[in-house]
């Protein structure tokens, strides 16, 4: 596993552009209000754009964090034909979000309730009905199933497991089920982390 930086946005920028952080435009997790991070510029060449130019169908499912709604960094403006997931990194800390995005449309997730005072989707879920990673897995499988066998595709599946919900404190390892670790005599956060990675 390789990470181009110690934090999310610059590391993803390195992966998407092929440049090291000395040459990338995104070098930190700089937020842009009301939602999102500093966006990739229009002229930035991404791996998705390279695939698209070569005739591939392209999709990003999961976490983005390189441009919020309507920005030059939005995945649909950076070479991805299809996007489903989180635009904002802090929003992606929550595995039971009130909404995700499908392309540029907000998709409400009924039954998920988040203490979300800033309006950017970040916070800790108090109502948990739909687990985001199950939704992302379903979307990824559907994207693959819908592909034409005669046309290549590129799918960037960007899951955040086992990232803790930083806004959740000690409750931050949100999983639908602790599985084999439910009866372990460990702190809840450690049992949640073990369930995420196994």
Each model region followed by its residue ranges:
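Formylglycine-dependent sulfatase
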Residues: 1-198
